[in-house]
Amino acid sequence: FGYMKTDYNVRIYYRNEQWGALEVCSEETIPMHMAATCLHYGQEAFEGLKAFRGKDGKVRIFRLEENAARLQSTCRGILMPELPTERFKEAILKVVKLNERFIPPYESGASLYIRPLLIGTGAQVGVHPAKEYLFVVFVTPVGPYFKGGFSTNPYVIIREFDRAAPLG
């Protein structure tokens, strides 16, 4: 894994208790207040998914709705506004389409890594949820996860013992 610049990222700002319009951006940096809650209180969530080019040339995105649901679950846990599933899907589909030229060919075994990120950008000192957030999605091509192919390992799972429990 590594970062390689692509053409575009997409962003949706949350202000005044509502999500704004989807914005297309080519800038790689995010202007941020030094008291942003993501910096001081960890008010941040991210997902990771991939787009693959099939043998037929069609682009397929792995587990899109499941990633949206997991991000929403994280948001509930750390008091961030949930991005609706349809908005999540809209952002992912848009950024993949805009950067389609970076999706590796089927034969390579590689993919386009998709990183959705939601951060608290509102300035806040004290443990309180931010009033402003940024949802941003960027992509980068990545090689196969198992470079030498997938092979099994001779490990045994022992279910009777747990290192963190008595007798473990």
Located regions from the model:
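Conserved alpha/beta cores of soluble small-molecule-handling proteins
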Residues: 1-168
